[in-house]
Amino acid sequence: MSFNSFGRVFRFSTWGESHGPAIGAVVDGCPPGLELSEADIQPWLDKRRPGTSRFTTQRQEPDQVRILSGVFEGRTTGTPISLMIDNVDQRSKDYSEVALAYRPGHADYAYDAKYGFRDHRGGGRSSARETASRVAAGAVARLVIPEVRIRAYLIELGGDRIDPAAFDDAAIDENPFFCPDRAAAARWEAIVDDARKAGSSVGAVVECVAEGVPAGWGAPLYAKLDSELAAACMSINAVKGVEIGDGFAAARLTGETNADPMRPGNDGKPVFLANHAGGIAGGIATGQPVVVRIALKPTSSILTPVETIGRDGKAADIRTKGRHDPCVGIRAAPVLEAMVALVLADQKLLHRAQIG
């Protein structure tokens, strides 16, 4: 199974399965001399960690990271950084039905069609458990781009959207939904509770804003910054759509409305009067905040019986036992931050290599 790596200069690979002994990442291309310890990584993993509220999977994983290589006397050496996270709370017996029949909407059938063999326990490599490795790698990436502030939050859950006028950055860390609208967060409690009680699930939309990205990062045509971000975002489990800036809404605007007018600033740089483009033009950063949005489908593993087929090709019904997120989008916020950080760290080093 190939394609477990991402990036060009700042590159990372993830490894491990949901119910294997451990998962992890190897970060290659990190500059030497950066201060790095487990304490720099753990807070980001704690944001994604399961079992922290009734609104996420009740799988209890401490997600304690260990640095196995690439760091000496508290600093990166420039060699590959190996990160490992033990799996301690697997219940593989809950997946006995999944071994024989495919979960509609999940990767079960597609993996079998391609490889003819799969690890059915918790979804194996296709499980969202893999994203913990990305978050660990993303924490290293943040050290490469200290000038950039990255913040992700949910703007929609189960079809219910936040009120932009009620946006409060301080509220994001006050609720289990990473929601910037306190009233929406209160409504979402009932939406997720109802979905869980019904044995169902709901989707979500997560937005991420990266501030401090310098003008010039990125590239034209086939290596656009927005195409790199889109590829990174689409690699996240359950993501079915990506928008940059206004995204699909831009198709409903006129040229005058969609333009991002500029005025001269006191420092010789432009002052933008709007940011419909999401901080990227021609594949290159403009210096404005980079805005990315992802849409996540409802979790495929549900208790409600669903029509499917077995590995033998015969008709079957399946209801997925085990512990699953009623909304996988909730814990996607720190994962999206990590993927944006990984792309931007790579872009910074690429820009330095190209321009000096």
From Swiss-Prot:
Per UniProt, the cofactor note for this protein states: Reduced FMN (FMNH(2)).
Sorted alphabetically, which Pfam families does this protein's record hold?
Answer: Chorismate_synt (PF01264)
Catalytic reactions on record: 5-O-(1-carboxyvinyl)-3-phosphoshikimate = chorismate + phosphate
EC identifiers of the protein:
4.2.3.5
The Gene Ontology biological process terms listed for this entry are:
amino acid biosynthetic process; aromatic amino acid family biosynthetic process; chorismate biosynthetic process
Q: Which UniProt keywords apply?
A: Amino-acid biosynthesis, Aromatic amino acid biosynthesis, FAD, Flavoprotein, FMN, Lyase, NADP
Q: Where does NADP(+) bind?
A: R48, R54
What GO cellular-component annotations does this UniProt entry give?
cytosol
Query: What does the entry list as the binding residues for FMN?
Result: R125, S126, S127, N237, A238, G282, K297, P298, T299, S300, S301, R323
What family does this chain come from, according to its entry?
A: Belongs to the chorismate synthase family.
Subunit info here reads: Homotetramer.
Q: What does this protein do?
A: This reaction introduces a second double bond into the aromatic ring system.
Name this protein carries in UniProt: Chorismate synthase
What lineage is this protein's organism placed in? Bacteria, Pseudomonadati, Pseudomonadota, Alphaproteobacteria, Sphingomonadales
* Gene that encodes the chain: aroC
